[in-house]
């Protein structure tokens, strides 16, 4: 199942790229993610709780950042196992950042494979859930940048001008 889309973020590309690399910030934008643990600079574990149709699922999730091309692209591999039912999901995520004036277009594509009880629900149900999660993610990342709560990009301070 492939899910793709585009989100407009009200910030410059470097700032968005920096924020997306900040695992706690990224996790705070994904509804239902908690207990984030950094294994090393490119590996993370977390718990994801979500409801699909009438069923609630809790997943143990592992993320591996497989490629970073600053400030344009981030690729990751995601694997998850539901804690209460038999199944598994794997996904490869590709994210491209395109500068659009003072905003950034975040273009993403996720190729996911889902097995077990969750996989039996069918693509229309799962795509609907993915769109719902995308909407929440977009709301949260936009709100973080609009309220100045996103991680600040590392910049060199400007040299102060001498007073006249």
List each language-model region with its residue ranges.
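A conserved amphipathic terminal alpha-helix motif
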Residues: 115-160
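Beta-strand/loop substructures that line and gate deep hydrophobic ligand-binding cavities in soluble
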Residues: 62, 75-128
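Hydrophobic pocket/interface hotspot
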Residues: 16-20, 26, 65, 108, ...
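Glycine-rich portal/gate segments that line the openings of hydrophobic small-molecule binding cavities
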Residues: 38-81
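Short strand-connecting beta-turns/loops that link adjacent beta-strands
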Residues: 12, 41, 70, 100-103
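Short beta-strand segments
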Residues: 5, 57-61, 104
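Hydrophobic ligand-binding cavity/cleft-lining segments
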Residues: 1-51, 156-164
